[in-house]
């Protein structure tokens, strides 16, 4: 038996940015505004989850922050799980949709990349 020490960097995420992203999306799933969810006790608003389109775990590969409005997507719980654990072809459709809606906003935040690069980074395939 050997001991294994693992060091992991966890990047700070802003709860304020997440809440403001939810408000900007009017507490609707940005991939399908028709998706319904339950009302959260803590906010008395539809329960949504914040998804970093480009994962915070990749922050060390970028010279600008990934914890910015343009990179935080308001998703219903089902879409959030699907974008992480769904079939690759379905995830690509979701990521293509996010890129189409967000690429200019990402560029204004200093995050410039092609659609193919975006999908590879978002899927951790680089």
Predicted regions located by residue number:
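A detector for short metal-coordination/catalytic motifs
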Residues: 42-126
């Amino acid at each position: 038996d050997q001991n294994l020490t693992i060091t992991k960097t966890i990047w700070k995420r802003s709860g304020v940015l997440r809440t403001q992203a939810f408000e900007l999306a009017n507490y609707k799933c940005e991939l399908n505004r028709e998706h319904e969810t339950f009302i959260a006790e803590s906010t008395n608003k539809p329960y949504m989850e914040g998804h970093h389109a480009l994962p915070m775990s990749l922050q060390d590969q970028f010279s600008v922050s990934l914890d910015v409005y343009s990179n935080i997507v308001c998703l219903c719980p089902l879409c959030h799980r699907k974008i992480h654990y769904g079939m690759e072809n379905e995830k690509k459709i979701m990521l293509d949709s996010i890129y189409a809606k967000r690429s200019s906003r990402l560029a204004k935040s200093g995050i410039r990349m092609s659609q193919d690069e975006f999908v590879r980074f978002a899927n951790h395939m680089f």
